[in-house]
């Protein structure tokens, strides 16, 4: 009986804990401290409320100015450009399940990071964390640094 209860307990814990995956791929020559300004390429397919604003505020935590551009032609004057995608799901309320950021400097990818709630978060309570919290984590690993400004 103890073994059955232990198995049920472990199974319940696995369902509730869920898994979050954050991946990063930085070029060896990438120096986040040299970044002062980033142009963000607006992705109209992302339907998460105020996503561009959340991303801009997240870079500001690191002392990096940014601006979102709706027109691809406007990005030609930018040295550093962020392209992104993000998905959301529903479970009583919408929440972000996936995001990927690609940072290009002079047309070359210098950093890439992604966030994924495995199984769309299942019963894990961390799926309810705000989009801002998830984006902040993603920008932190994208830059390979901790925020300097709160």
List the predicted regions and their residue ranges.
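Solvent-exposed loop/turn segments at secondary-structure junctions
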Residues: 45-46, 88-91, 118-120
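Secondary-structure boundary/capping motif
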Residues: 47-51, 93, 123
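A structural "domain/chain start" motif
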Residues: 2-11, 16-65, 147-150
């Amino acid at each position: 009986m103890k073994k059955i209860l232990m198995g049920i307990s472990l199974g319940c814990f696995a369902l509730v804990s869920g898994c979050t995956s954050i991946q990063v791929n930085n070029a060896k020559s990438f120096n986040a401290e040299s970044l002062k300004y980033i142009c963000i390429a607006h992705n109209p397919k992302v339907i998460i409320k105020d996503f561009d604003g959340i991303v801009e505020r997240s870079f500001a935590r690191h002392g990096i100015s940014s601006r979102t551009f709706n027109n691809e032609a406007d990005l030609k004057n930018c040295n550093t450009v962020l392209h992104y995608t993000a998905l959301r799901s529903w479970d009583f309320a919408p929440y972000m399940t996936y995001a990927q950021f690609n940072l290009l400097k002079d047309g070359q990818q210098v950093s890439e990071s992604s966030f994924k709630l495995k199984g769309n978060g299942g019963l894990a309570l961390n799926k309810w964390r705000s989009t801002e919290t998830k984006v902040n984590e993603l920008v932190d690993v994208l830059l390979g640094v901790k925020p300097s400004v709160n």
